[in-house]
């Protein structure tokens, strides 16, 4: 969302672009004492409080994903997670653990020379690739 514009997402996409730029600016301002990097997470459905039942149903309807309102909330969330996963190169849902792993890596000594970068944890969301 920070690099690829789309209709109906002006404020959201602008905020993402601003956050990415802030990471780069802070990396410059705080170096060499502090390394600043950012994570660009994809949609995490499982375990997210952002997806109560009504929002899940709204998203399933928006994306024309077949469902039955009698299905339990977790089954509906799984359908939505699989839809998002299907748009990625890895075809697997992104989890909170995936995000945590990337955050841990960024704070570890393994990436001690990395600064001013945005790490995407999105399963290879090719729609977000820079053109």
Give the residues covered by each predicted segment.
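Conserved loop-to-helix N-cap of the C-terminal "lid" that shapes the substrate pocket in Rossmann-like
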Residues: 38, 73-81, 92-100
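Generic structural signal for alpha-helix termini and adjacent loop/cap motifs
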Residues: 108-112
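Short C-terminal tail/terminal secondary-structure segment
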Residues: 103-104, 114-131
């Amino acid at each position: 969302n920070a690099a690829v514009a789309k209709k109906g997402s002006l404020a959201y996409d602008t905020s993402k672009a601003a956050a990415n730029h802030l990471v780069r600016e802070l990396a410059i301002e705080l170096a060499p004492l502090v390394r600043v990097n950012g994570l660009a997470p994809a949609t995490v459905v499982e375990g997210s409080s952002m997806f109560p039942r009504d929002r899940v149903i709204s998203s399933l309807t928006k994306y024309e994903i077949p469902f039955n309102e009698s299905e339990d909330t977790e089954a509906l969330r799984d359908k939505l997670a699989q839809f998002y996963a299907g748009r990625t190169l890895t075809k697997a849902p992104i989890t909170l653990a995936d995000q945590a792993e990337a955050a841990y890596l960024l704070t570890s000594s393994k990436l001690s020379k990395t600064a001013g970068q945005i790490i995407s944890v999105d399963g290879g969301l090719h729609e977000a690739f820079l053109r």
